[in-house]
Amino acid sequence: MKVQRPKGTVDILPAESGSWEKVETIARNFFKRANYREIRTPSFENYEVFSRSSGESSDVVEKEMYDFNDKGGRHIALRPEGTAGVVRAYVENKLYGPDVVKPFNVYYIDNTFRYERPQAGRQREFHQIGVESFGSNSPLADVETIMMGHDLLAELGVKNYELHINTLGNAQVRKDYHDALVNYFTPLKDQLSEDSQRRLSMNPLRILDSKAEEDKQFLPDAPRIVDYLDEDSKKNFETITDMLEQLGINYVLDDDLVRGLDYYTGVIFEFMVEDKNLWESATTILGGGRYNHLVEEFDGPETPAVGFGIGEERLMLVLKEQNPALFEDEGIDFFITNIGEGTEMKAVEIARSLRKQDFKAQYDVDQKKLKQQFRKADRVHAKFVITLGAKELENGVLNIKRLADGKTLDLSLEDLNDMKSVMEKIED
């Protein structure tokens, strides 16, 4: 039997994992500067965590979620998105208590799972970078979250991205809009796709996000939520957009934007990238919004919240096209070559010392001929080669060579204890 990875999964090999690490490090440092701390939740949860949060009628729950009964008969689901598990952890660990500073701000970088048709930037196991902020209903919290998404994409080197924004209003607005959609689509029910016929009775808002050809003809004339917003919802949304304008963050008011999960309330947003080398049309790489009732769904107290998630696979496709420097092999700082009796352990000691000084250093564990060692140094993209022979060891003097231009420098074994000073001499 040929052993292969499951369909919809990808091996991120060392040639690529370095660029993933760079992106995630940039994201981690970015979030830390905003005082967001990391949270790690299980890769699988009880099924109800996701069915209650995402909505029984959502495509995620109906079609895409990996769920099963474990050996103890428990109904388990693999994490299809990041927010629900974080909310569950927030409630279960009583992070809503008065001893926890609000807003409670966290970020995560996790693998997630959905049974989808694999394609470029979309796998059945994929990765999400996300943030969640609990405890503030201020429009400034929404703006902070949107601004973070905007600025993170800029820091990563993403180009040609556009912010699309909409609001779903409050609970009463959602109810009124729900009724309007039911009234509009009910006479058309027999002409809708099978999925949308089912959604009509469960959550007609989902019909607006349908990609089925039989549904698309009815969407342009469907009611728009903007016509059902009350004054408070309008004022809140105007405050948010005014702040974005003051911050110089351009946006597109998008009445068609509804998002794919049922827990959103208030402002929702997506950052879309247009790159003809990747996709025929603009594609979402970051999406989020406000969800003020999800904590209550998990039996917690009334808690406003807002957040976003980034699909890391799509992000990496964009960055490979738009910021290729992130994908360059940085190589190592030093390769220690050695020849002659008694030099092996000294090469090990030198590499060990350099690593302790935060340099990347390697030596040849196979102890091949010197010519082969130099060839290996070139293949691993070493910046410098340190050569150690029996004579050099006896005299306590080493030779260091910069491979880029051949510049050399002799140094004593003691010099290795302060290699940063040696590097400064070479650069002069």
Curated annotation (Swiss-Prot):
Compartment list: Cytoplasm
Protein name: Histidine--tRNA ligase
Pfam families linked: HGTP_anticodon, tRNA-synt_His
Keyword Repressor applies: no
Record-listed E.C. numbers: 6.1.1.21
Keywords noted in UniProt: Aminoacyl-tRNA synthetase, ATP-binding, Cytoplasm, Ligase, Nucleotide-binding, Protein biosynthesis
GO cellular component terms, semicolon-separated: cytoplasm
UniProt GO MF annotations: ATP binding; catalytic activity, acting on a protein; histidine-tRNA ligase activity; transferase activity
Protein's organism: Lactobacillus gasseri (strain ATCC 33323 / DSM 20243 / BCRC 14619 / CIP 102991 / JCM 1131 / KCTC 3163 / NCIMB 11718 / NCTC 13722 / AM63)
Main EC class the enzyme belongs to: ligase
Protein family according to the UniProt entry: Belongs to the class-II aminoacyl-tRNA synthetase family.
Swiss-Prot/TrEMBL GO biological process terms: histidyl-tRNA aminoacylation
Principal location listed in the UniProt entry: cytoplasm
